[in-house]
Amino acid sequence: TYFPAPTDYGEMPLIDGDSLKISSEDDRPVVFVFKTLNDPSQGRISFIKVLTGTIEPGMELVNARTRKSERMAHLYVMCGREMTEVGHAYAGDIVVVPKLAAETGDTLSVSGKIEAAAFKFPNSQYRIAIEAENRGDEEKLFTFIDRACEADPTMRIERDEETGQTIISAVGEAQVSVLLNRLEERTKVEARTVPIRIPYRETIRRVASAQGRHKKQTGGAGQFGDCYLRVEPLLDGTDYEFVDEVVGGHIPRALIPAVDKGVQETMKDGVIAGYPLTGIRVACYDGSYHPVDSNEMAFRTAARIALKKACEDADPVVLEPMENITVTIPESYAGAVMGDVSGSRGRVTGMDTNNRGETVVTATVPYAELVDYATRLRSLTRGTGDFTMEPAGYEQVPYDVQKHLVEFYEESRAQGR
């Protein structure tokens, strides 16, 4: 009595440019998943709207995205927190279906070939790392937020394997704040936000050589390893290359892999600031061994000593990740945005106007300067700006930045952190 009948809508446009006629009499139902939640009693539940036709419990429909069949075992009508089971749903009805694998925005139909236009969600531009106050609650924290992300497509959660951080992407700070409050209320897990760690790298800029010698005598069988390494920068984008140049049996062939292993172990922690070493060729060109005391452990240790010495003489530098950003803003804010890019050690690479009359600025900026860019851009443009970014490789950091990173690393080591 308050809204027009669904059949009055006529035809609904589809993604492929075709249209779908709305009718309750159609024996080929089409439904659209517009929300997904995790209910405490029912588990995963999907809110669906019947676009056309009629559905009943036990019916199987095919997901257009996954091409997999999904069975709607039960249909419920939601009223507040109460769920009432029903025997059918017609075009225009909204019902709840438990335990579907479908995600928000999916279309299900008899053929699986019909796909309604999904929602266009705002970009999740705000990124922040979170951690539980109690380390033992980390898994519970991740599980809760992962389920929250299923219900809210504007949020994403990921684990950075390199830094070990759990990172949330959201529309803004308020969304994350509400999520953490809900986490504490429902699970008693306290969590806090922390800055995102930047995945810096280290490399070298010139060729250098060094000897690594490890000798240890403890009364019984000792340890002896001796190798000469030459390091040189790789300029073709390759991360690492190991070359065996030993001749004359100065190091037995069976122990060469131990040298390689010792080198790679050292590369994980870098040589000046604690970041992984990359873009380096290492050649083992000489050494010596003891027929009794030489073993794999001794040569791994010798390789670590030699690599650190060689890299310290090879002009080591710190690299930082760069991002290509595309910022869309009203023309009146172009100057402020480009000034901010320049002040963030970035380079403006282009400026254009899109078909809506907005200014589009492209730039390359260090990732370290972009971790709070969503908040900064909102302030610069009074909430009217939008941006996207994608990785653009690594570049050497300025001298003052490297000095700060090295000093911080040395201070942390001195304090045992």
Where are the regions a protein language model picked out?
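Structural and coupling elements of P-loop NTPases
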Residues: T1-R417
